[in-house]
Amino acid sequence: MHTATTVYELRVYHAAPGKLGELLARFREHTLKLFEKHGMKSVAYWTPVDEPEKSDTLIYILQHPSREAAAANWKSFQDDPEWKSVHEKSEANGKLVDKIESTFLALTDFSPRLP
């Protein structure tokens, strides 16, 4: 549900060379469930169609009740022992992500309402 304080977080992950498949698998098998556990609502996930981004980029949007909730959600996610274990195991052969970009967004008054 969208409220006046609802924020959307656009996140762009730039995978380490050759690691996009492993990053997508981590999201598919673990990360989405952990996001839900920590109050982060997944809106959608994309991979670019064209190079050079096609081979190393994951883009997604999360919904949070507020900026404050987003900060608390990320803290609880990062402190979660299950996430720490998944993260460590998934990076046993090297880090999966080179760079993460995060931008918080607010819906405009003329935007179609999102779920």
Question: Which sequence ranges carry the predicted segments?
Answer:
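Basic/polar N-terminal segments that are highly enriched at the extreme N-terminus
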Residues: 1-5, 114-115
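An amphipathic, aromatic/His-enriched active-site/gating alpha helix that lines ligand/cofactor pockets
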Residues: 2-3, 22-43, 51, 63-104
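Accessory recognition modules or surfaces
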Residues: 3-8, 12-14, 47-48, 53-66
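Mature N-terminal segment immediately following signal peptide/propeptide cleavage
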Residues: 18
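Acidic/histidine-enriched, glycine/proline-rich intrinsically disordered or flexible terminal extensions
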Residues: 97, 106-115
